[in-house]
Amino acid sequence: MGQIHGLSPTPIPKAPRGLSTHHWLNFLQAAYRLQPRPSDFDFQQLRRFLKLALKTPIWLNPIDYSLLASLIPKGYPGRVVEIINILVKNQVSPSAPAAPVPTPICPTTTPPPPPPPSPEAHVPPPYVEPTTTQCFPILHPPGAPSAHRPWQMKDLQAIKQEVSSSALGSPQFMQTLRLAVQQFDPTAKDLQDLLQYLCSSLVVSLHHQQLNTLITEAETRGMTGYNPMAGPLRMQANNPAQQGLRREYQNLWLAAFSTLPGNTRDPSWAAILQGLEEPYCAFVERLNVALDNGLPEGTPKEPILRSLAYSNANKECQKILQARGHTNSPLGEMLRTCQAWTPKDKTKVLVVQPRRPPPTQPCFRCGKVGHWSRDCTQPRPPPGPCPLCQDPSHWKRDCPQLKPPQEEGEPLLLDLPSTSGTTEEKNSLRGEI
């Protein structure tokens, strides 16, 4: 306990351009379950494959990971196949299939051999649950007792950067924290440090009150491995050897975020409008990401997304949806309806204001008819008499008193020799040469 190791986890990789953050977190959560841990090359190949898969229409609705696994080419480098296989298993696990009914086999007959696998089918290898885990700040080296490594500043900065654009308690906020807890396996003291680094003092106080309530209920209910004589749950969860109790405390720490008050400002997703030339699919994707970042966890997103997909669309898409009767249809129907819509090419015409006829009244400046006062060529008269000479006919800058007087006896030009004599001298010089 308290031993500091030099090995530190790499920062959370960035999502490829065009992929939603909540989708990327699902892939990261599956990648960190691999043993040994994925390398930078594995993440690079995963990003490369997802960039190619983004061109397919599987991102419009909840992703079918089985369909995504069929898009992986044979012999694709990295561990992309294992990551997709984990997601396929998690997607199928909620609806467990019924147990197969055993068929009676006659003792005299031999069971038919299984058909050979087709060489053309590309089936990902089965996922094998790792026997040992290597998480941080709790280190689990094989064949040695668990040890604790405190938070490093770059770990906290990486987590804060991921949740900076998400609202408190939103699905993306909670999914990022779950991924960080799964990757680092923090103790109770580490979780308290993380909370103080991410949230304000008010949120820390409210979270602490809710966490104490949940811990009291859990201690009363009873937990596997919990010994009331060994101290409170928070103290036992700080022990690196008590992995089960630490997991229970981590789940309670995450559950305490569900009752925190949200942001009282107007939600940002309510002001998202479709641009005049923006594709409808891109507009719905922006709405989807904004709802993931702004809605509290557990709030149904589908009705709000359908309502905003029609009310915040531009007028042309609203007319198309209204004509087809898809104002409150499933999101897939609305996307297919507006899929072929393209903005019309509107020719920009320069509107020139016609010239008004000349006025019939005389100009206020010169008294003539036929032009406006702003077009008059007559200089503007001074507002009053000159402050120097009291003459009302000129401005101060034109006052003759400001000009220096000239002497009458001094000639303006010097006496120059006559041009005839100069010409004769030049001709004589040319003749001598």
From Swiss-Prot:
S-S bonds: none
Residue positions of motif PPXY motif: 124-127
Compositionally skewed regions (Pro residues) per UniProt: 97-121
Assigned keywords, A-Z: Capsid protein, Host-virus interaction, Lipoprotein, Metal-binding, Myristate, Repeat, Ubl conjugation, Viral nucleoprotein, Virion, Zinc, Zinc-finger
Pfam family, one: Gag_p19
GO cellular component: viral nucleocapsid
GO molecular-function term, one example from the UniProt record: structural molecule activity
Zinc fingers typed CCHC-type, residue spans: 361-378, 384-401
Disordered: annotated segments: 94-121, 397-433
Sites annotated Cleavage: F136, P137, L350, V351
GO biological process: viral translational frameshifting
Source organism, top-level taxon: Viruses
Lipid attachment residues per UniProt (N-myristoyl glycine): G2
Residue window of motif PTAP/PSAP motif: 94-97
Comp. bias (Basic and acidic residues): 423-433
PANTHER family for the chain: ENDOGENOUS RETROVIRUS GROUP K MEMBER 24 GAG POLYPROTEIN-RELATED, IGE-BINDING PROTEIN
Misc: HTLV-1 lineages are divided in four clades, A (Cosmopolitan), B (Central African group), C (Melanesian group) and D (New Central African group).
Protein name per its UniProtKB record: Gag polyprotein
Native organism: Human T-cell leukemia virus 2 (HTLV-2)
